[in-house]
Amino acid sequence: MPKLTDRNRDRDREKKKRRRRDDSYDDYEEEGGISGWKLGLVVGVIVVCFAMLYPTLFHPMLMGFLGRSSQPAPSINQQRPPIHPAMGGGGGQRHPGGYPSRPDVHPAMRMAQAQAEGQSGGSKGMFTWMLPIYTIGVVLFLLYTLFKSKGKKAKRKKRNYFDSEDDSEDSEMETKYGGKFGKKKLKGLQERLRQTEDAMSKILEQLESVQAGANPVDLDAADKLALELEEDKSAKEAVGLTETNEQYIKDLEVALKEFQSLSKAYDKEKMKKLKRKDSSSEEEEEEEEEEEEEEEELSELSEVEEEEEEKPVKKGKKVVDQKKPAKKAILRQKSTSEEEEETRIADKKAEEEEEEGIDIDFEIREHAERNKKDKNLRRRRPKKT
């Protein structure tokens, strides 16, 4: 096992070194392409452009700033020989460009010369406008390449710094674990780790059994085993326990006890919830019975009202006299002060109806509405606890 771990570490280190070398070569190639002949070419183009623009653009600008006006030299056409003034014919008209007008020249030739001069002037103007734009673009490209090369150099320095830190950490780990410990100590540590893994697997199995509820854990037996191990040094050596492992086992025992207490509390809460559900179901049944009784009373009243509606209206007074005791019997069932007031109001209305001889249908409707209101009030009352 230790040999395999050492080999794996060596492989990882070699892979890291290869990656670093590849990155460094890539950066070097990119930087070399930017900082080599390309920079020289850009500088040469800038110098040529400046030399071409100086006499036509920069020199007149400098002279204008300094306050000197450069007079243009008279241009002489080299194709034609100079003509004597006496050959021109007295005080005739002169050419606007400083040339004497020749009568022997055809007008078409004069037009062609004027067009050629205009085209040459236009081409020169375009050339003078395009060259400064080109120089500005080249300068911007040069600045961009310079800044880019500086940024890459800074990134490369950061990478080298982090790589050096990783190398130092690897060397420290080697000195801590590889240099100090020998093979025997490593084997002993591996055996102890295996023993702790076995103990953990057993504890997990016991926890699963506790959750299932089939095989509860015997904590007394675990305490006895711990005491025996503390007393017998030979048993400790055989099992390979250390102080850290003993503390770990004690912590696990405490956790098991807490788990049992939590499971008991959970069972108690379950029982309480079941009892509450039973009590709530009983209360609901009582409420349903009360509602059924009220519905039966309302159905009886509706039947009585239908029978009264079938009787003729002439016997209105007699029906009212027969209806009074039934109304009084229903209203006596009410216990609150509001119900007593309603009975008084109903009695007064009945007396008024007897005196005036009003129909009974209106009174029956009012009575049905009152019963509905009473039913709603009973439902809104708080439940008995």
Curated annotation (Swiss-Prot):
Bilayer topology annotation: Multi-pass membrane protein
Record has Isomerase as a keyword: no
Residues annotated as transmembrane: 39-59, 127-147
Composition bias, Acidic residues: 163-172, 281-310, 352-361
Compartments reported by the entry: Endoplasmic reticulum membrane
Pfam families referenced in this protein's UniProt entry, alphabetically: RIC3 (PF15361)
Descriptive protein name: Resistance to inhibitors of cholinesterase protein 3
